[in-house]
Amino acid sequence: LAMSYQYQTPGYAKAPTALCEAAEKYIIEKKPELLAICFEEPDHTGHTKGHDTPAYYQMLKELDGYVERILQAIKKAGIWDDTIIIMTADHGGIKTGHGGKTLREMEIPFIISGKNVRKGMEIKESMMQYDTAAMIAYILGLKQPQSWIGRPVKTVFK
């Protein structure tokens, strides 16, 4: 869940619920300044049933419930007004694979919301996995190493 706290989930069948419960507890008790919650899904479904399939979209719908619970935990912890939330993925995909050179495989979804983030703005630029670290570094006020190829999309901020 965070650099100072690791949590191993008990397999795919129980993982989303167990991870969500652990995240809720951690958020409410610790009020973390930085937290990464990495669900196994929809990645597993994308690789077994295919990306852009009814099963994939059903899994996204299920995950929406877990995301809502996490958002409620942030509110309950009293840190909502100071929080920036990023939802993203580690890759795009075609059929059941990824790793190719097409934009559908390399681009990632990137949703950002929260403190000082413009509401209702669509990011027009392509977002790649390596841009995520650059965005987080920018949010935290950290200097980006020159060797990084990622870039923060500063236009999302007020």
Language model feature labels by segment:
Residues 1, 21-65, 69:
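Active-site His/acidic residue clusters
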Residues 1-30, 132, 138, 152-156:
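Active-site-proximal alpha/beta segments of enzymes that process anionic O-linked groups
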Residues 10-17, 54-64, 123-130, 147:
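Soluble non-cytosolic domains of exported or imported proteins
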Residues 30-35, 79-85, 115:
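Loop/turn elements at helix/coil->beta-strand transitions in domains of secreted/extracellular proteins
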Residues 41-45, 91-94, 116-118:
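Solvent-exposed loop/turn segments at secondary-structure junctions
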Residues 101-143, 154:
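Substrate-binding rim/cap in mid-to-C-terminal beta-strand-loop elements of soluble/periplasmic
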